[in-house]
Amino acid sequence: MKTLHVELGERGYPIYIGRGLLGHPDLIQAHLPGGQVLVVTNEVVAPLYLDRMLASLAGKDTGSVVLPDGEAHKTLDSAMAVFDALLARRFGRNAAIVALGGGVIGDLAGFAAACYQRGVPFIQVPTTLLSQVDSSVGGKTAVNHPRGKNMIGAFYQPRCVLADTDTLDTLPDRELSAGLAEVIKYGFIRDPEFLAWLEANVERLLQRDPEALAYAIERSCINKAEIVAEDETETGVRATLNLGHTFGHAIETGMGYGVCLHGEAVAIGMCQAADLSRRLGWIGDDEVARVIRLLERARLPVVPPRELDADAFLEHMAVDKKNVDGGLRLVLLKSLGEATLPVAVDAGLLRATLECYGR
């Protein structure tokens, strides 16, 4: 087992990474303040891991909520189902919520924890590659609005993150590739040595080589923890983690939540961001080709859906948390291994990317 730390003073917490961690109840119980625990999961994860999770909570007053699977259910209605379960069991402020699932469950359960009785502790138990390397770390919690992804949320840190890599054994291939998009992103935005390693080892990751996966998860979490420690609430460097996300969120919203997985949409968005960075003269054709090629090798889509034209993209991109005073701002690439903070860009060049890249 590897143990990393997110350094946020009194609100700092450990990230545990390793195989078989769900079978070590002492790990999770050490971070529970009281005797009441609600496990929030979904209908895909529950048959695989809910009983094991509840066994790790033996001796506690436990309950569970099993929600429908998918981004389309990351809603206020689903959050209300969590609140209903907490209230039905008369759980108080010393109760804890355990998020057992991927990014949707982690975001939703964390949001519910931030809101219930003005905040109760929660623990992240991510079961997908994407959630283990990205969404479970850093305290971003949210639900979606029909007009925009993650528009209703809060910064609220977990008590710990428990990443049992055994759960990746049951992860569908498509979900594994979607998680690799966020792994690869760290190489693009700040870690060129990791990028070179990924270019040499992406096939090992697709084959689920345990050593390669363990290294990629650890290196990704180190990058994420360092960024969060420097900028918890995204007023500076944390915004670079949004490379490809403005384009990607437009795809997710425009196509309907769940049609494209988050990692798939981000992969396309990173290619669009690379194309726009080239048009601005910051990177060259060779760098754009490296971006596209690595994502293709990770079995990710690299061209935008034909159903979304430039005007549709711009309409959805106008609803983005990085925008300032109604003006669009994007995270782009200065080089492979260095991202910009959100910047305003020439409208003509942006439209050229939206109209020409992948069309």
From Swiss-Prot:
Pathway the protein takes part in: Metabolic intermediate biosynthesis; chorismate biosynthesis; chorismate from D-erythrose 4-phosphate and phosphoenolpyruvate: step 2/7
Any one GO biological process: amino acid biosynthetic process
Any one cellular-component term (Gene Ontology): cytoplasm
Gene3D superfamilies xref list: 3.40.50.1970, Dehydroquinate synthase-like - alpha domain
Family that this chain belongs to: Belongs to the sugar phosphate cyclases superfamily. Dehydroquinate synthase family.
Function of the protein: Catalyzes the conversion of 3-deoxy-D-arabino-heptulosonate 7-phosphate (DAHP) to dehydroquinate (DHQ).
Annotated NCBIfam families: aroB
Name assigned to this protein: 3-dehydroquinate synthase
UniProt source species: Methylococcus capsulatus (strain ATCC 33009 / NCIMB 11132 / Bath)
Gene designation per UniProt: aroB
